[in-house]
Amino acid sequence: MNEYKINIPRLKLPKKFAKSPAKYLRKMVIDNAEGRGLLTPENRDEYLQRIDHEIAVFERCGYVEYLLGVVKMTKEMSLSGMSYFAGRGVFSASLVFYCLLITNIDPIRYDLLFERFLNPDRINMPDVDIDFDDDGRYRVFQYIEEKYGKEQISHVITYGTM
């Protein structure tokens, strides 16, 4: 039984996309896919089909704005000169994350299954592992607190012993 409810904040989107975050996400993904040189005549259909599939799953699961928040956060951190690594974990199997410059692994090239990251039958939110340098992680906390309010976020930590 879930003892908590996750509230994904509504993001300020360009007016043209205010009522359709998924269309905004798709535009960003397509623009970046073209920028990465992925939409060549030989593989355009394969990449567009995978992009549309992933975005449809994000939309069905209600995670489009969550993903847009992750994109905004990583972009802000990158612009501020902070180092981060986002290639660990199953979300590296997402072409959307690759197109949005969050990961550097082309899941089609390496035949990675998106459904390992997210599928409509999954009960839990997807686990997005992003590692920040030690000094930067506090800047990330500060950014998120300022953006969404201290009362709207929580910190989770796992301790391991040997």
Where are these regions (language model features)?
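Phosphodiester-processing cores and adjacent nucleic acid-binding clamps
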Residues: 1-162
